[in-house]
Amino acid sequence: MQKIVLLNPKGGSGKTTIAINLASYFAVCGLKPTLMDLDAQGSTTRWLSKRAKGQSEIHGIAAYERNSRVTRSFATRVPLDTERLIVDTAAALETQQLPDITRNATAVLVPVLPSDIDIHAAAKCISNLLLVAKIRREEQRIAVIANRVKKNTLIYKALMRFLETLNIPVVATLRDSQNYIRVAESGQGLFEMKPNQVREDMEQWLPLIGWLAQRRPLDIPPGTPGITSGTTMNTLPAAQPAAAAAPAPIASTVMSPVVSAVATAAPAPASDETDPATVPPAAPTLG
């Protein structure tokens, strides 16, 4: 299983948008995603409630809800057959919570908007991930997503100069697009739309998807405790225990040719909108 954490204590950076589109992508690929909502606003939970019957299944956990009758560890259990756990964190996240939330994460994605305030907040966030959460650079688990960018603007160039100094891979550059608003309102993701409607946006996700495909999955024994606290992950029994299998291929009959190409893609290059000279090299393949 992969645990992918979307994290940036600065509100409005696009964590939820990226989380729901990742979940829908994995669902269409048949990779059994679980979407955990840690934000009291419940945005990802509301998005899940809008999904129509017949859409690819995504298991949801409203982890922000408090229930005095059960422990937090019990309430945040993950189904055993989950292959991709996507964690959407809250804004104004307290620094001391970082070790618990990022524990066992195979990837921590930090969305950054092109503004001076967001650049400063991202620098602090990444510093805390390194110093407080104790995630080492050489583990190649932290990556940045340049979000809602408008190419050829001065602030975009300033953002890319800043990201160059981090020595953290920039795995996607996503444009400011109304398509994200439209799909969210209908409980869908980009990868569930007709390719000719969202092709440009889908193409910008390919480097991120390729980078995530290189992450080493977690090998977690059934029933081990704790997902946001403790030392290991807490899991729910699967409805039908699944035997270990190779990652499901991306079906060209379901996905567009643009996205199905990810199945055989080489290690992720920089996005088309990203100047390769400003982007740290992609992480090497693990395992």
Where are each of the predicted segments found?
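Extreme N-terminal, non-catalytic leader segments
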Residues: 1-7
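P-loop/Walker-type NTP enzyme "switch/lid" segment
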Residues: 7-13, 20-99, 103, 184-188
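Motif I (Walker A/P-loop) of helicase-class P-loop NTPases
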Residues: 16-20, 122-123
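Inter-motif core of Ras-like GTPase G domains
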Residues: 96-116
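Conserved C-terminal guanine-recognition region of P-loop GTPase G domains, centered on the G4
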Residues: 122-137, 147
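Beta-strand-loop-alpha "switch" segments that mediate conformational coupling across diverse proteins
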Residues: 150, 160-191
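Inter-lobe coupling/hinge region of RecA-like P-loop helicase motors
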Residues: 182-201, 206
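P-loop NTP-binding site
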Residues: 216-287
